[in-house]
Amino acid sequence: VNDMKAIIDREFDNFNALKENTYGQKIVLTYQAKLNDRAAADTGRPGFENDVRLEFSNNPDHDSEGSTGYTPWDTVVCFTYKLNVYKTNNHDFKLEGAKFRMYSDESCKNEVYVKKTESGYNVINRDSTGGTDHTGGTAPAEAVEMVSDKDGNFIIYGLDGGTYYLKETEAPAGYRKLLDPIVLKVVPTFTT
C-alpha cells in the first residue's frame, strides 16, 4: 500500500470534531467464547485456555485478495466452578426431594437456568436464551428445578464467580420450605 493515510482519509472522512483523522491508533477487537457442557463439568483444572489470532488483509482495496498477515496469538484463561449442595434437617438427616431454583439477584427475579445431566445440573448460558450472562432472556425448554437425591445432595456445574441466591421452591413431605434464599458467594482465588 503506497499511501495508507490516503486510504484512511477516503474510508473514514472527517473522523473527529476537527474534521481530521487520527493516525497511529490501536485497533481493539473483542471476542467471546462459550464453555460447552463438557468443560462446565470439568472443574478443578487450572483454567480453560482460549487461543485466538486475527488474520488480516495487507491490501485494504480488495476483498479476500492478496497476501494476509496475522496478529500474535493471544490467550485468555477462563474458569468455572461447581457447588455441592446438601439438604438436611436440623439433626443432619439427609432429605430427598427438596426442590430449588437459583437466581443472580437478591429479589430472585433473574433465574440462573440449569439443565439436568448425568452428574448433576449444568448452568445454561443466558446468551443462548436472549439475555446476557445471568440476566434477561426466556426460559429454555431444557431448564429444570434442582432436586436433592436420596443422599440430600445435588451438584451445580458451570458457575461463574459472583453471588447467587438458592431458593427452595418445595420442601420434602413433612417439612416446611426455607423462608429466605440461601446466599452463595463464589469468590475465586488465583495464584500466580
State the predicted function of each range:
Residues 1-192:
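Solvent-exposed loop/turn and edge beta-strand elements of beta-rich ligand-binding domains
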